């Protein structure tokens, strides 16, 4: 996912400036990573029936992030982890509104294909997945974070390990466990 033309060091330097109170640094980071954020948004909206578009999702995420009282980001991976979390919240809110309009519906069948979901009823699935992730977080916050960062954030195993401060092998085990748990929970 990383754009080779955007240096990790530049993003980290700008995030440091943001921590020091330079609010313009956030806009510069956003400009530098906009293309990658669009790719992240597209992955959040991979369901064929999605009516929320990529640009709207990226812009709504920007508004939520720029208004955050205090953003304490360490590096590019941490930034994408937060952006993924915010985008997931926006997609879930959108699904709730959409689901409220439809009320009801059939049961949802969910299958994992390595890292992607096969979706039959988008709004219902997003809500079911969000509820299951809430239950997973109660069981194990780390399993939940690994799934969220890998699936919603599009982070690699290495980036996920860096963000969470754990070993690569731990991320690999947790990624396997979280997908298996969610598969059982949502079957």
Predicted feature residues:
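Short, charged helix-capping/linker segments at alpha-helix termini
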Residues: 1-4, 20-28, 39-60
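Sigma70-family region 2
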Residues: 16-20, 43-48, 60-78
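Σ70-family region 2.3-2.4 aromatic/basic alpha-helix that recognizes the −10 promoter
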Residues: 34-38, 55-63, 76-97
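Amphipathic alpha-helical segment used for protein-protein interaction
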Residues: 37, 117-145
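Short, Lys/Arg-enriched C-terminal cap helix and immediately downstream tail that follows
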Residues: 41, 179-187
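Short, basic/polar amphipathic helix motif occurring as a linker/hinge flanking DNA-binding modules
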Residues: 48-57, 73, 80, 94-117
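Short amphipathic alpha helix immediately N-terminal
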Residues: 137-159
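Helix-turn-helix DNA-binding module
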Residues: 153-173
């Amino acid at each position: 996912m990383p754009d080779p033309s955007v240096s990790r060091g530049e993003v980290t330097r700008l995030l440091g400036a943001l921590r020091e109170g330079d609010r313009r640094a956030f806009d510069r980071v956003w400009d530098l990573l906009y293309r990658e954020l669009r790719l992240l948004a597209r992955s959040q909206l991979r369901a064929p029936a999605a009516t929320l578009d990529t640009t709207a999702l990226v812009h709504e995420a920007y508004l939520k992030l720029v208004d955050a009282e205090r953003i304490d980001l360490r590096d590019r991976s941490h930034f994408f982890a937060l952006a993924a979390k915010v985008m997931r919240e926006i997609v879930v809110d959108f699904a709730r509104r959409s689901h409220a309009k439809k009320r009801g519906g059939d049961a949802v069948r969910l299958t994992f294909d390595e890292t992607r979901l096969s979706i039959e009823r988008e709004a219902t699935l997003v809500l079911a997945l969000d509820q299951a992730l809430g239950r997973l977080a109660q069981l194990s916050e780390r399993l939940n974070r690994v799934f969220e960062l890998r699936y919603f954030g599009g982070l690699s195993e290495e980036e996920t390990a860096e963000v969470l401060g754990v070993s690569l092998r731990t991320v690999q085990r947790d990624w396997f466990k979280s997908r298996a748990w969610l598969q059982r929970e949502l079957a």
